[in-house]
Amino acid sequence: MAARSAKYMYQSSRAGHGGDISIEYGTDLGALTRLEDKIRLLSEDLESERELRQRVEREKSDITVQLMNLTERLEETEGSSESVTEMNKKRDSELAKLRKLLEDVHMESEETAHHLRQKHQAAIQEMQDQLDQVQKAKNKSDKEKQKFQAEVFELLAQVETANKDKLVAQKTVEKLEYTVHELNIKIEEINRTVVEVTAHRQRLSQENSELIKEVHEYKISLDNANHLKGQIAQQLEDTRHRLEDEERKRSSLENHAHTLEVELESLKVQLEEESEARLELERQLTKANGDAASWKSKYEAELQAHVDEVEELRRKMAQKISEYGEQLEALLNKCSALEKQKARLQSEVEVLIMDLEKATAHAQALEKRVSQLEKINLDLKSKLEEVSMLLEQTQKDLRVKIADLQKLQHEYEKLRDQKEALARENKKLADDLAEAKSQLNDAHRRIHEQEIEIKRLENEREELAAAYKEAETLRKQEEAKNQRLTAELAQTRHDYEKRLAQKEEEIEALRKQYQIEIEQLNMRLAEAEAKLKTEVARLKKKYQAQITELELSLDAANKANIDLQKTIKKQALQITGLQAHYDEVHRQLQQAVDQLGVTQRRCQALTAELEEMRVNLEQALRAKRAAEQMHEEAVVRVNELTTINVNLASAKSKLETEFSALQNDYDEVHKELRISDERVQKLTIEVKSTKDLLESETERVTKLETIKKSLETEVRNLQIRIEEVEANALAGGKRVIAKLESRIRDVEIEVEEERRRHAETEKMLRKKDHRVKELLLQNEEDHKQIQLLQEMSDKLNEKVKVYKRQMQEQEGMSQQNLTRVRRFQRELEAAEDRADQAESNLSFIRAKHRSWVTTSQVPGGTRQVFVTEQESSNF
């Protein structure tokens, strides 16, 4: 007998884990007990590995359930309910196929187990055929080794693909971080623009305060002008009282002249009868002395300029008493002198009549002006009615638009209810799917063989990769949408800038036109003033020359009358010229009134724009509420989908869309701020134009006051001349005085009309002041609205920061989920490797019942199993 031992060695290396498996087996008849112990240990290891595998499968099934729920939710948000039902049907069919496959695999596994048992029994019975079987097993082990190596290479390729996917995901994350950084930079730029807008607003408020101060100064100047106007009216009343006093003086002088004529007739009778006339003359002298004393006592204060003439009369009367002969000659000389004075007074009265005719012509012109102003007033009333009709129409349109908005809101609420109903149905379907998946997981737990499990894991990996790719495609689609929205935003911004440039050009053209018109008006006023001054100087010179000629040409009265008529015609022509200049000035005033009407229409347009701004503000508030609702929904979704990577991608895309919507809202707010600033600038320009108009009107008022003062000086000169004429007037002046009185009444009526017109102008000025106050109030309201918009922008910035923080938190959660998934994958791979090793060891051990098994554990994680088989033979 000699003992023969055969030793076989099997080595296998796993590149993924760095562990080597070496199997040495031989035949030993005395090692069965130890082999059974090792088999027991290996079976226990197998059971522990199976338990670990089942636990991993449970966790994996939970993760798959969560993945399916998330994919269903994504499909609910992106697609419609029909697509979801089709996908569910497809998944049900796939689940049925998988169940059939699992049942087939289970049957096959049972059959293989039974077959292995039979083989084990046959191996125990037939010990001699073990060598051939060992050789066959060796060949099989070589084949299995090749298979394992191929599987290892496949697993390495999968690891490389996973690493590539990881790099791609990291690149996408870096891109997203770069986009977030760019968005932060944009937000900082927007904050800077908001700060600039606030500074511009403060500057506008300062300018507004300065304009208010200027308006206050203008009010003070208007009050001073009104005070001067009252003083001028008082002066006119004083002149009227003086005229009445002069009329009374004139009537007294006429009575005195009549008495003098009676005395002349009595003196002629005395010449014929000297003796009788002496007594009568003495009586008349006594009467005349008494009358003269009475007249002297009455009119000493009133006729200081005519005291010399009264004294001459007294001396002449004394000479009559002393020397009758000399008195007759003196009386004749006096009569001739009185006739000359009468002729001179008549010429002066004719001059006064001409002046009064001029005054009547001026009164007629003023009446025409009044009629024109009434026509203008009627036109303005008609325009005001038209504007009121337009305002009512716009209000009706506004109401219609508000009703349409309410309808749209109602439809939006209906759609939201439908969306909620669809979400409920999708949740029900998700629950059904979860139940089906739980059943599928129960079926999976029955599977014991590792190869089928590896295939299933590979399929699940492919599904995860497909889901990851789908998420990547969705992210790319969202990025394309974002780029398209940014392009549209840039296009709209460019369009708005073009419109603003066109409006600014139109405003500049209008400003230039108004400046040209104002310069033309100033030139015309200057020309009219120069012409008036030259004509007044020429008239003064002519009047002085005529007065000298009249004084020198007492003998040629008829020629002087003819010359006076000629001069009267010339003066009438000059008056017509002055009236034409006055009409031009009035036309310019009318143009100024039209410009005021234009400014009022602009103010109405500005009020309409303010109403539009309010409507836009309401829309912005509604958008803000909608954004808050969307934010709440997003928060709910984020709380639901914090543990899953796919949900992170969907939530991230939603947050990006919401951020773009908020960015659009912020751009709209910025545009509204810019539009409000432009409107404030327009208001300041219009206030400046009204200020210039007020200055021009005040200048015109001052010019009119100077003209009025010159006319008052002329009236005073005329009054002095009238006093001289009345002092030297004789019989025949009553009718002239009556005419003068009627003319003076007409002049008084004209003065009253002028007062009334002045009162109307004051009313217009008050209305303008009221309008300026309204504009200031509107400006303050605009500032308040700007402040509200700024507060809204601050709130939006805060929301953006919250969204950023939530995105960062979700990214952290996604990274945690990725690490967990990778850890589970590593554990699964390790468990699969251990199961493969255990199964291979069992197969070899069951094939060889006479074997001696030794195991050793390397600290690096490798496990070595030594099987030694010995065979004895007798020679």
UniProtKB/Swiss-Prot annotation:
Keywords: Allergen, Coiled coil, Cytoplasm, Motor protein, Muscle protein, Myosin, Thick filament. It comes from Blomia tropicalis (Mite). PANTHER family: CINGULIN-LIKE PROTEIN 1-RELATED, MYOSIN-6-LIKE. InterPro entries: Myosin_tail (IPR002928), XRCC4-like_C (IPR014751). Residues 110-143 are annotated as: Disordered. This is Paramyosin. It is found in: Cytoplasm, Myofibril. Belongs to the paramyosin family. GO terms for cellular component: myofibril; myosin complex; myosin filament. Residues 29-854 form a coiled coil. Residues 1-28, 855-874 are annotated as: Nonhelical region. Paramyosin is a major structural component of many thick filaments isolated from invertebrate muscles. Homodimer. Its main location: cytoplasm. Pfam families: Myosin_tail_1 (PF01576).
